Amino acid sequence: MDELQRLIETLTAMETLMEQEGEALHRVQPDRSGWSAAQHFYHLALATDLGLRNVRSLVAGKGRLIDHEAPPSTRMPELIALGHFPEGAEAPRIVTPPEAVNPEFLATELAAAKEAAARIAATGADLAAVEGRVVHQDLGAMDAAQWATFARMHAEHHLALGQRVLGS
């Protein structure tokens, strides 16, 4: 199964939890995480939107963030080899969730992320063959395949954190 399909499945699992858990999604459990499950999912939805925009730009070969000269990320291959994201990283301000998450907005953003991943998958593009990179502020310059892997791994990471907060 490819990265985009796995991402879609993870986002679907988040949507299912949102339907099942209701108000529990908005409770912070400080012994489990500094964020509520809704905040984890909100952060993930925003970050996924940005990551998939990078994939779309790279596939299209257009975009002001594309860099053909940047050296490839050395950190992303390490994360891929590790198989998961370590805990404890601080979210960039642009994707930091508010204290109170609007559930309708969150549902819309998760659905939009799924749709974006499906649209990219439907192009049939071989992401590993796409040229160019877009720089991630912490991980360095990543190609389209790495951005898709990042989105999937990041989603799985925050799904697991959300589940832990919910005790499920």
Please provide the spans of the model-predicted regions.
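Amphipathic, well-ordered alpha-helical segments in soluble domains
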Residues: 10-20, 47, 51, 113-116, ...
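Acidic/histidine-rich alpha-helical segments that form the ligand environment
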Residues: 6-7, 74-130
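A short small-residue
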Residues: 24-28, 90-99, 134-138
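Helix N-cap and loop-to-helix transition residues
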Residues: 21-22, 36, 101-105, 143
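Short, contiguous alpha-helical
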Residues: 27-80, 122-168
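Extreme N-terminal tail/first-helix region
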Residues: 1-13
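Short, charged, low-complexity loops and linkers
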Residues: 1-4, 32-33, 98
